[in-house]
């Protein structure tokens, strides 16, 4: 999974990966591994990221479930 959209959203909200990790209750290292595709986000983490980054429900697939072509 490519999370460039999610990284862009983090930056657009004026946050760092460390800020986001703290707000969703995981370590910055864990968030970085997930953003690089080494491990998957849990449903709870996706929900929390959407809350923290103000991602509307209709846009969730674009951030978390976009298929690779």
Residue ranges and their predicted role:
Residues 44-59:
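DNA major-groove recognition helix of helix-turn-helix/homeodomain DNA-binding modules
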Residues 14-33:
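Short alpha-helical DNA-recognition segment
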Residues 3, 8-9, 13-14, 22, ...:
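Short, charged recognition helix plus adjacent turn
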Residues 35, 45, 64:
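DNA major-groove recognition helix of helix-turn-helix
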Residues 15, 41-44:
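Residue-level signal for the short linker/turn that defines the boundary of a DNA-recognition helix
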Residues 7, 18, 47:
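Residues within the helices of the helix-turn-helix
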């Amino acid at each position: 999974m490519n999370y460039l959209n999610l990284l862009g959203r983090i930056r657009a909200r004026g946050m760092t990966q460390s800020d986001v990790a703290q707000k969703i209750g995981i370590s910055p290292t864990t968030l970085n591994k997930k953003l690089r595709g080494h491990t998957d986000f849990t449903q709870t983490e996706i929900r929390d990221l959407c809350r923290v980054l103000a991602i509307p429900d209709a846009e969730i697939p674009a951030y978390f479930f976009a298929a690779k072509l």
